[in-house]
Amino acid sequence: MSFYESVFIIRQDVSLNDIDKIVDDFTKIIKDNNGTIIKKEYWGLRTLAYKIGNNKKGHYYFLGIDITSNVKEELERKMKLNENIIRFLTIKADSISSEPSPILKNQSTENTPVIDVTINN
């Protein structure tokens, strides 16, 4: 198993409940294949650098995961098929830090996003 960091952008008009359902679907795939979710972060609704389709903003979500390459391919396949996800990127990492990501550290306290860190030894 290897560490991966995955960031995906969900359309701006998707509700927070629907975002939770999307993330739960990915979580189920990971756990069903003996993977581990080390860190989940919702980075909030952010303005995109350029318009993607009709979207000027998007909900950013980060997953720090420990999975096999086959599970990574399955997650990416599901992301491609989900019409609510407008962009995604998954990269291999040496390790996943339990600290909040730099994006969370730079955000103002009035927009406090959700962070869920689980370290399994």
UniProtKB/Swiss-Prot annotation:
The role this protein plays is:
Binds together with bS18 to 16S ribosomal RNA.
What keywords were assigned to this record?
Answer: Ribonucleoprotein, Ribosomal protein, RNA-binding, rRNA-binding
UniProt source species: Rickettsia prowazekii (strain Madrid E)
Keyword flag Ribonucleoprotein: yes
Q: Which GO terms describe its molecular function?
A: small ribosomal subunit rRNA binding; structural constituent of ribosome
Family indicated by similarity: Belongs to the bacterial ribosomal protein bS6 family.
Q: What is the lineage of its organism?
A: Bacteria, Pseudomonadati, Pseudomonadota, Alphaproteobacteria, Rickettsiales
> CDD domains from the entry?
bS6
The protein in question is named Small ribosomal subunit protein bS6
One biological process GO term for this chain?
Answer: translation
Stored InterPro entries: Ribosomal_bS6 (IPR000529), Ribosomal_bS6_sf (IPR035980), Ribosomal_S6_plastid/chlpt (IPR020814), Transl_elong_EF1B/ribsomal_bS6 (IPR014717)
User: Which PANTHER family does this entry report, sorted A to Z?
Assistant: MITOCHONDRIAL 28S RIBOSOMAL PROTEIN S6 (PTHR21011), SMALL RIBOSOMAL SUBUNIT PROTEIN BS6M (PTHR21011:SF1)
Instruction: State the superkingdom.
Output: Bacteria
Pfam families the UniProt entry points to: Ribosomal_S6
